[in-house]
Amino acid sequence: MKIGIIGAMEEEVTLLRDKIDNRQTITLGGCEIYTGQLNGTEVALLKSGIGKVAAALGATLLLEHCKPDVIINTGSAGGLASTLKVGDIVVSDEARYHDADVTAFGYEYGQLPGCPAGFKADDKLIAAAESCIRELNLNAVRGLIVSGDAFINGSVGLAKIRHNFPDAVAVEMEATAIAHVCYNFSVPFVVVRAISDVADQQSHLSFDEFLAVAAKQSTLMVETLVQKLAHG
């Protein structure tokens, strides 16, 4: 099995990258892909860049060039569920765009023409992630993750997301674009991210302060998940 892992920022991939043995770097389309073995398992780790276009471009290049069997999207996210704290884990059961609106033509808010309203994560990957969470004794929430090209840092943007997606547990900027590409390629995916901030008016300050905490927690989760997927 070859496992594809995608993070947007240097801070989100550096700990995983340092753990890859026999590492080689591939530069394509402004993205960097690091291939090798993570604890004996073949992996391809993509640093995509921030935002939906960068994530979709990178995911496409990763799938075409490295042919992974599954995709794990890792990194940080803003917490929407009331129980979430910095360092807690969110696991997707679905991903949706929070900034797409073609409702004038009868589509659901967040749905693009020709696409489902949401992109479902793979049940087996979800189950494996939840098993890792139990083993590591981490606090986690599973649910809807929403994505858009905005850092949510204020009451207006937050209120709009809560209105349109009352069940969303986290918000970030890449996951749904990655899920969209995986849907088109029929490749199973799951989003496993750690909370770096709670989406509110102080979220930019929390993000800067706690990104390293989120990166450490998400790296721990991904490393454990890769082991479980490879060896059961």
Swiss-Prot record:
Pathway: Amino-acid biosynthesis; L-methionine biosynthesis via salvage pathway; S-methyl-5-thio-alpha-D-ribose 1-phosphate from S-methyl-5'-thioadenosine (hydrolase route): step 1/2. It catalyses: S-adenosyl-L-homocysteine + H2O = S-(5-deoxy-D-ribos-5-yl)-L-homocysteine + adenine; S-methyl-5'-thioadenosine + H2O = 5-(methylsulfanyl)-D-ribose + adenine; 5'-deoxyadenosine + H2O = 5-deoxy-D-ribose + adenine. Signal peptide: none annotated. GO terms for biological process: L-methionine salvage from methylthioadenosine; L-methionine salvage from S-adenosylmethionine; purine deoxyribonucleoside catabolic process. It holds the Pfam family PNP_UDP_1. The active site is at residues 12, 197. SUPFAM superfamilies: Purine and uridine phosphorylases. Substrate binds at residues 78, 152, 173-174. InterPro entries: MTA_SAH_Nsdase, Nucleoside_phosphorylase_d, Nucleoside_phosphorylase_sf. Its EC number is 3.2.2.9. The keyword Calcium does not apply. HAMAP family: Salvage_MtnN. Homodimer. Belongs to the PNP/UDP phosphorylase family. MtnN subfamily. NCBIfam families: MTA_SAH-Nsdase (TIGR01704), PRK05584.1 (NF004079). Catalyzes the irreversible cleavage of the glycosidic bond in both 5'-methylthioadenosine (MTA) and S-adenosylhomocysteine (SAH/AdoHcy) to adenine and the corresponding thioribose, 5'-methylthioribose and S-ribosylhomocysteine, respectively. Also cleaves 5'-deoxyadenosine, a toxic by-product of radical S-adenosylmethionine (SAM) enzymes, into 5-deoxyribose and adenine. Thus, is required for in vivo function of the radical SAM enzymes biotin synthase and lipoic acid synthase, that are inhibited by 5'-deoxyadenosine accumulation. This is 5'-methylthioadenosine/S-adenosylhomocysteine nucleosidase. It comes from Salmonella newport (strain SL254). The lineage of its organism: Bacteria, Pseudomonadati, Pseudomonadota, Gammaproteobacteria, Enterobacterales. The gene is mtnN.
